[in-house]
From Swiss-Prot:
Keywords assigned: DNA damage, DNA repair
Protein name: DNA mismatch repair protein MutL
One CC-aspect GO term: mismatch repair complex
Pfam families registered for this protein in UniProt: DNA_mis_repair (PF01119), HATPase_c_3 (PF13589), MutL_C (PF08676)
Function: This protein is involved in the repair of mismatches in DNA. It is required for dam-dependent methyl-directed DNA mismatch repair. May act as a 'molecular matchmaker', a protein that promotes the formation of a stable complex between two or more DNA-binding proteins in an ATP-dependent manner without itself being part of a final effector complex.
Gene, per the UniProt record: mutL
GO process annotations (BP): mismatch repair
Family from the record: Belongs to the DNA mismatch repair MutL/HexB family.
InterPro entries: DNA_mismatch_repair_CS, DNA_mismatch_repair_MutL, DNA_mismatch_S5_2-like, HATPase_C_sf, MutL/Mlh/PMS, MutL/Mlh/Pms-like, MutL_C, MutL_C_dimsub
Classification lineage: Bacteria, Bacillati, Bacillota, Clostridia, Eubacteriales
A single MF term (Gene Ontology): ATP-dependent DNA damage sensor activity
Entry keyword DNA repair: yes
Length: 674
């Protein structure tokens, strides 16, 4: 039978350390919070090797009394509370007395501190929980603590650490959040002796935001605030230009403590989406000040989670504050141009001048025209002989930057397409329900075209040369067409291409189709290491937030192989010199920012191939859009390119690119048959 044992202090501290000290950023959090509780106004953080080799914190707080230096490293020793009642009215960031003994048990610690009432300070050296020395030292008022060789005596914990770059990024993100919560404190962060962050400590939150996230972010913020009897809510929310695909740029503080609360995050997002339908997550910095008695922070060892006595009330206050600010912002930015007002007034006067009889006559004729069926004497030839290209000739054409077949080889390729077109692909059954399933369309068309395609390819005698995209003709011609050549009829709503083949009408989403072409082309080029690049006439210098720069630096090789030529420009700035050829019309700054955000969402566990696919998906932004007018030739080229990609039936996001209606289905819809 197992007997109950009393654990020794070392074992108990290491168990406690497992809860409190998860990684280097946990150490930084606990020590910086101690500095803030001591009233420090200047805090310097230095790290080496992602915090594993060294974490050094220097502050100008009140310091630790000489007689309490040793006592501070005893378990549950704290100056923050005295009894149980204090737990329910906590005004400090720390209170458990677990951090220092937990850290000292798994690292080598050099602790120095001095209070203003004494001429000398005290220095305590501890290694693995064992005191090595306690001596006097000379220093200014405040505290300095060095934590070296983290987890040196618990090597199993090291296996769970991420890369040095990632651990550094986590520390940087943590210090950024703490800086936002304390704009009246000056923070300096050094990583491997390089200054990463320096806030002014002037008490202005907007200055801290500008330092961390950049000038453009600070210029696109909306301030909000709401005050109630038991809670005050205030902060900034970004407009739609700052919305991102992840929640990385969301910060929530309760009584200056950085916490995570799903309910309050949803409150902000719901208020934001009342005025924006981007589907992305808003940037926000939210502060909630309330009485300590109305919250409970003692539910998690890291104090990162919090409970409210009345969470529904807080939810409503947050929602109302953000919603009101967004409503005023939209109202202020919406203005009717004076020119449009003048046109409206002129038109109104013109209508008033018309006689009542003429208005009645006009309305009656309009009613007759709406309810009147198509005249019997209108010939079908007039409908089917209509040439849509005439309407498009006078409009601006949209260039499609991807064409798998070069202009020199298009003529030759038409011989194959014509041979496919001349074959009779008959419907297997006339009576079928209308189908929107791209898989069914794919399988049906693939069966129809495969046999004829192989016969046509056997008869073709193309020479193996390179086209303008670097693909050999062999690579292009001997790729199977996934559906037969369609005849373009026109464009509907400047969004869908109408085409026909063998008594079947096809609707192609021009944006979805083009983005899939670009996606497969770009993915293939990355895999084969032959991405064609486009030099920028004027290189762009982009200053990134520190966290974004660290992600870029970690994935620098990914960007290079994806066709970007980027060089460091100092102080978290990068210089964009070249981009992939078909992305040159996009905003490189927004493109790089979006790619970094996508990589941040993926984390470090994904493979290089997955990251390449994620970057390739950004090619969607270069695709033709809905409401882009295309000429007949452009639509034909788009469909021709679509035929030869690996999966022409889905866009990169999984949506269908093609749907079809058979003649039978249309006849049934018009009740020509029963």
């Amino acid at each position: 039978m197992n007997r109950i044992n009393i654990l020794n202090a070392d074992t108990a501290n290491k168990i406690a350390a497992g809860e409190v000290v998860e990684r280097p950023s946990s150490v930084v959090k606990e020590l910086v919070e101690n500095s803030l509780d001591a009233g420090a106004k200047n805090i310097t953080i230095e790290i080496q090797n992602g915090g594993e080799s060294l974490i050094k914190i220097i502050d100008d707080g009140s310091g630790v009394h000489p007689e309490d230096v040793e006592k501070a490293f005893n378990p549950h020793a704290t100056s923050k509370i005295k009894d149980t009642y204090d737990i329910f009215s906590i005004n400090t960031l720390g209170f458990r007395g677990e951090a220092l003994p937990s850290i000292a048990s798994i690292a080598r610690v050099d602790f120095k501190s001095k209070v203003s009432d004494f001429d000398m300070g005290k220095e305590l050296v501890i290694s693995g929980g064992e005191k090595e020395s306690l001596t006097d030292c000379s220093m200014n008022r405040g505290t300095q603590i060095e934590v070296r060789d983290l987890f040196f005596n618990v090597p199993a914990r090291k296996k769970f650490l991420k890369t040095t770059a990632r651990e550094s990024a986590l520390i940087n993100d943590l210090v950024n959040r703490i800086s936002l919560a304390n704009p009246d404190v000056s923070f300096k962060l050094f990583n491997n002796n390089k200054k990463i962050l320096n806030t002014y400590g002037n008490g202005k939150l907007i200055d801290v935001i500008r330092t961390i996230y950049g000038k453009s972010t600070a210029e696109n913020l909306i301030y909000f605030e709401e005050h109630k009897d038991t809670a005050s809510v205030y902060g900034f929310i970004g407009n739609d230009t700052l919305a991102r695909a992840s929640r990385n740029n969301q910060s929530l503080f309760v009584n200056k403590r950085y916490v995570k609360n799903r309910s309050l995050t949803v409150a902000v997002e719901n208020a934001f989406r009342s005025f924006n339908v981007t589907g992305k997550f808003p940037f926000f910095v939210l502060f909630i000040d309330t009485y300590p008695e109305l919250i409970d922070v003692n539910i998690h060892p890291t104090k990162s989670e919090i409970k409210f006595k009345d969470e529904r009330f807080i939810f409503k206050v947050v929602f109302d504050a953000v919603h009101s600010a967004m409503r005023e912002y939209v109202k202020d930015t919406f203005t009717l141009p004076e020119e449009e007002e003048k046109k409206f007034e002129a038109l109104k006067e013109e209508v008033i001048q018309e006689s009542l009889d003429e208005e009645i006559s006009t309305l009656e004729k309009l009613k007759e025209n709406i309810n009147y069926k198509v005249s019997e004497d209108r010939k079908k030839e007039e409908i089917y002989s209509y040439n849509p290209s005439k309407d498009y000739e006078a409009k601006t054409e949209v260039n499609i930057p991807v064409d798998f077949l070069s202009k020199e080889n298009q003529e030759e390729s038409f011989s194959i397409n014509n041979s496919l077109e001349n074959n009779n692909f008959k419907e297997g059954s006339a009576k079928r329900e209308i189908s929107y399933d791209p898989i069914l369309i794919k399988n049906e068309l693939k069966d129809k075209v495969s046999e004829s395609t192989s016969e046509s390819l056997e008869r073709s005698d193309y020479k193996c040369n390179k086209n303008e995209y670097g693909n050999s003709i062999e690579e292009i011609i001997y790729r199977e067409a996934k559906f037969p050549k369609l005849r373009v009829i026109g464009q509907f709503n400047k969004t869908y291409i109408l085409a026909e083949y063998d008594s079947t009408l096809y609707l192609i989403d021009q944006h979805a189709a083009h983005e899939k072409i670009l996606f497969e082309k770009y993915s293939s080029d990355i895999a084969k290491k032959r991405v064609e690049i486009q030099p920028l006439m004027i290189p762009l210098v982009v200053t990134l937030p520190t966290e974004d720069y660290l992600y870029y630096d970690e994935n620098k090789e990914i960007f290079e192989k994806a066709g970007f030529k980027i060089s460091d420009f100092g102080d978290n700035s990068i210089r964009i010199e070249e981009v992939p050829y078909f992305l040159d019309k996009l905003n490189p700054t927004e493109l790089i920012t979006s790619m970094i955000n996508n990589l941040k969402k993926m984390g470090t566990g994904e493979t290089v191939e997955v990251k390449y696919n994620k970057i390739a998906s950004m090619s969607c932004r270069a695709a033709v859009k809905a409401n882009d007018v295309l000429s007949i030739l452009e639509m034909e080229n788009l469909i021709e390119d679509l035929r030869y990609i690996n999966d022409p039936f889905h866009c990169p996001h999984g949506r269908p690119t093609i749907i079809k209606f058979t003649s039978y289905e249309l006849d049934k819809k018009f009740k020509r048959i029963t």
